[in-house]
Amino acid sequence: MRIGVPAEITAGETRVAVTPETAKKLIAQGHTVCVQSGAGVAASVPDAAYQAVGAEIGDAAAAWGSDIVLKVRTPAQAELAGVKPGTVVVGMLEPYNAEGLQRLASAGVTAFALEAAPRTTRAQSMDVLSSQANIGGYKAVMLAADKYQRLFPMLMTAAGTIKAARVGVLGVGVAGLQAIATAKRLGAVIEASDVRPSVKEQVESLGAKFIDVPYETAEEKEAAEGVGGYARPMPQSWLDRQKAEVAKRVAMADVVITTALIPGRAAPVLVTEDMVKSMKAGSVIVDLAAPQGGNCPLTEPGQTVTKHGVVIVGETNLPALVAADASSLYARNVLDFLKLILPKEGGLKVDLEDDIVAACLMTQNGEVKRK
C-alpha cells in the first residue's frame, strides 16, 4: 500500500503523524511511504531523515494521492478537495464533530478517528488521548513554572528560606497524574481533586494529597466511577460540596492546573471567577480544558491573560509545544493501529468484528458510521 503523510495545516500544529522510526517499519513491511516536504520540520525531523530510511519526499498532492493518509488533525475541506474516494484517512478526526465527519463522508473517504478507540488493555498501545495527555500534563507544569514569579522548590539559603509552591491539580486523568509527577519533581507541595474515588491511591502514590469529598448517596458513587475510564456528569449535590472544598484549596494555591474533560461536552467549570478573585496576586492557572471552553470561565482559548492579578494560561495545544516527543509517541500509536487494518498478507482489511476497528471507523462509502 502507498501511505501518505501530508504536512499539518492547522494553525499552531507542529506534530507529524509518521517519524523516521515508524516510516522504516512500514517500509520494511512492504509499503511505500510518501512524506510531504517539510512535514516533520516543526517536530525536528528534516526531510533527509525520512529519505535516509527509504521514504519518498513529495508535495501535498503526492501525499494525499496515497491509498492511506496519516494525519494528526482532522482534514480541512481544502485538503479533501482532490482526494480519491475510498482513500483511508487515519488520525485524530474529532469523533464528536458532526460537521467534520460529514465532510469526510462527503469526500468518500474511509476515516478512522483514533480518539474513539475503547479504553481497553488491548487498545492501550494506540491510545492517542493518553499519549498526548501525558505530554500535555508535563508541559502544563513547565508553563506554570515559567509564568510563576517564584520558585517551585523550598530553598534554604543564607539570605533566608523560600517556601515551596503549593500546586492544585483538578482532574486526575493521564494529564493530571503527569502534572502531579512533574510538579513533585520540581519540589512543589501538591493537592489533587477528582470525581472518581479510585484515583485517590494513584494521587497518593505520587506524593500528593487527595482532596476527599465523601459520597452521600448510591447515585453519587455510581456516577463517580464513570464509564470506560471517563468521568460522567456528577449529581448537583456532590458538585456543590466539592466546589466548596476545592474553593478553599484554590485560595491557598500558588498554581492551579485544571484537566477535567467530558467527551463530546463543554468542559465543566471547576474554578469560578470568585475563586480566581480569592487567589494571591501572581498565582497561575493553566487550563488544559481550554479547547473545550475551559474549566475556568475567565480562560481565553489560545491566550495567556491576567485577570484579578492571576495569570491564566489557555494554551489549546500543549502537546504541539513538545512536538518531537509528541510526534514520536503519536506515530507509534498510529503504527499499532495500522497493524489492525493492514494484514501481513497484504491489502486493506476493515474488520468490524474487531472492537477497536469498529469503534474508530467514522465514515465509509459516503456514510457517517458513528452513531
Cite the ranges covered by each PLM segment.
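Glycine/threonine-rich flexible loop motifs
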Residues: 12-17, 78-82, 91, 229, ...
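Short glycine/serine/threonine-rich phosphate/pyrophosphate-binding segments
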Residues: 174-182, 200-201, 259-260, 265-270, ...
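An N-terminal-biased, well-structured beta-alpha scaffold segment characteristic
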Residues: 5-103, 107
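Adenosine-phosphate binding glycine-rich loop
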Residues: 115, 121-159, 290, 296-371
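Glycine-rich phosphate/diphosphate-binding loop of Rossmann-like nucleotide-binding domains
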Residues: 6-45, 153-249
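Glycine/serine-rich phosphate-binding loop and adjoining beta1-alpha1 elements at the start
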Residues: 2, 8, 75-166
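A structured beta-alpha segment of the ubiquitous adenosine-cofactor-binding alpha/beta core
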Residues: 54-64, 74-75, 221-256, 260-273, ...
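Rossmann-fold NAD(P)-binding glycine/threonine-rich loop
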Residues: 95-123, 265-318
